[in-house]
């Protein structure tokens, strides 16, 4: 299987998000990379489903809460930017203050 660097990145984010979901199910608080991966995966999959950029920007801020991440992680993440493929092309989606 020949994957482009971008496809490899998307696969890595997806896998990290799967790990994060399993940890949340066990009650384990997420670290920085896991939180970023989970939010990023939500945006990428939402774009794939045809959701609007504005909708993903808003909904992306409700994927995880402060109670689900380790102490200090919410303060470290001010914005999450994800390049996602929508039905009409690739767009940059920014989720502001994603952990509330």
Curated annotation (Swiss-Prot):
Mainly localized where? cytoplasm
What CDD domains does UniProt report for this protein, alphabetically? Urease_gamma
Q: According to its UniProt record, in which pathway does this protein act?
A: Nitrogen metabolism; urea degradation; CO(2) and NH(3) from urea (urease route): step 1/1
Q: Which InterPro entries match?
A: Urease_gamma, Urease_gamma/gamma-beta_su, Urease_gamma_sf, Urease_subunit
Q: What is its EC number?
A: 3.5.1.5
Which GO biological process annotations does it have? Answer: urea catabolic process
**Where in or outside the cell is it found?**
Cytoplasm
Provide any one GO MF term from the record. nickel cation binding
For this record, the Gene Ontology CC terms, alphabetical, are: cytoplasm
UniProt entry keywords in alphabetical sequence? Cytoplasm, Hydrolase
**Superkingdom, taxonomy of origin:** Bacteria
Reactions catalysed according to its record: urea + 2 H2O + H(+) = hydrogencarbonate + 2 NH4(+)
The family assignment reads: Belongs to the urease gamma subunit family.
Subunit-level organization: Heterotrimer of UreA (gamma), UreB (beta) and UreC (alpha) subunits. Three heterotrimers associate to form the active enzyme.
Q: Which HAMAP family match?
A: Urease_gamma
What is the protein name stated in its UniProt record? Urease subunit gamma
What is the originating organism of this protein? Allorhizobium ampelinum (strain ATCC BAA-846 / DSM 112012 / S4) (Agrobacterium vitis (strain S4))
Q: What is the lineage of its organism?
A: Bacteria, Pseudomonadati, Pseudomonadota, Alphaproteobacteria, Hyphomicrobiales
Designated gene of the protein: ureA
């Amino acid at each position: 299987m020949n994957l482009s660097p971008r496809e490899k990145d998307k696969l890595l984010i997806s896998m990290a998000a799967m790990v994060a979901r399993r940890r949340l199910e066990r009650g384990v608080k997420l670290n920085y990379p896991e939180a970023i991966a989970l939010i990023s995966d939500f945006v990428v999959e939402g774009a794939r489903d045809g959701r609007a950029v504005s909708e993903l920007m808003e909904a992306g801020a409700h994927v995880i809460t402060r109670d689900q991440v380790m102490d200090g992680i919410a303060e470290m993440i001010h914005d999450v930017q994800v390049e996602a493929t929508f039905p009409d092309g690739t767009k940059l989606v920014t989720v502001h203050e994603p952990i509330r």
